[in-house]
Regions:
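Domain-level signal for soluble alpha/beta catalytic cores
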Residues: 1-306
Length: 306
């Protein structure tokens, strides 16, 4: 059970802005790596100083969630540390951190401190949301980051290493999952392309489960699942949170069968491909349509894994 991120305007920016050294601007830094079909884009994160955690970023959010959950396990979501490197103004970042390794040292330390406090507050299920690694399957996005002087393959490895550093002190009784997609804003997305180019790097993450976007052809096929480490869970995001059309049970079962050719069925799960409202704007579907989709997920899961 999550809080739906109701206290956040933006699923990622609000959390990172809670750290010292991260400020916001209205400047346009996204170039071609923008959400398709909308002129509105997220605000720009600027790195104004060394990143520190002088106070909790969202500890109170979790405490509220835990106080109202009567049945089920409270799950807290936070953006991957990669989101700052990928989506912040690169000039401001390099000015403060000429050595990117120092950025990761400071940023992942903030994450470890936040996660430790969440754990002590009772959090036992953490989801890290990442819209960077999956985008490297899109040649246009790769080219955009090459213009910044990046090597997309090395970035994928670096971002996975950052996640591993952030969760390295997590106790054994805390489940950590990572959700990867290609952007979710007002039913729009940033990138297209499958997981194949980054599968090996992504699956080297030390998390317990991978939530993966597979709701449309732009997400590619299931073949990259052959790289999933033994015993790790894969949650197939087959139900779109971007459109109102309700997926048929037969089609969902068919796609689960296809995925099971590359990873054991007992290690697979089913979910929507992303959140229904990753920002305060929401997506282009009604509350009722949202609930029908969630019911469809539950019904199909019960039939497949009964």
């Amino acid at each position: 059970v999550t809080d739906g991120e109701f206290r956040r305007d933006w699923w990622h920016i609000d959390f990172l802005h809670g750290f010292d050294g991260v400020e916001l601007s209205t400047g346009d830094i996204y170039g071609e790596a923008k959400f398709q079909g909308t002129h509105e884009q997220p605000p720009t994160m600027m790195v104004a100083g060394r990143i520190r955690r002088s106070k909790p970023s969202m500890l109170e959010h979790f405490k509220f969630l835990k106080s109202v959950v009567r049945k089920g396990l409270p799950k807290f979501t936070m953006p991957s540390p990669a989101m700052l490197h990928a989506r912040a103004d690169r000039a401001s970042l390099k000015k403060v951190y000429p050595d990117v390794n120092e950025l990761w040292a400071d940023l992942t330390q903030c994450y470890r401190e936040e996660i430790a406090e969440l754990y002590h507050a009772g959090c036992r299920y953490l989801q890290i949301d990442d819209t960077t690694i999956a985008m490297w399957g899109d040649p246009k996005v790769q080219e955009q980051f090459r213009k910044l002087g990046d090597d997309p393959q090395k970035d994928a490895e670096m971002y996975t290493a950052a996640v591993n550093a952030a969760i390295r002190d997590v106790p054994d009784d805390m489940t950590v999952a990572i959700h990867t997609c290609r952007g979710n804003f007002k039913s729009a997305w940033v990138a297209e392309g499958g997981y194949e180019p980054v599968a090996e790097a992504m699956f080297s993450s030390g998390v317990d489960a991978f939530f993966m976007e597979f709701d449309s052809e732009r997400a590619g096929g299931f073949a990259p699942l052959r790289y999933v480490p033994k015993g790790k869970k894969v949650v197939l995001g087959l139900v779109s949170s971007k459109t109102a059309q309700l997926e048929s049970k037969d089609e969902l079962k068919k796609r689960i069968e296809q995925a099971a050719r590359h990873a054991p069925l007992e290690n697979l799960c089913l979910s929507p491909q992303c959140g229904f409202s990753s920002t305060h704007h929401g997506n282009k579907l009604s509350h009722d349509e949202q609930w029908r989709k969630l019911e469809r997920v539950v019904d199909v899961a019960r039939q497949v894994w009964r």
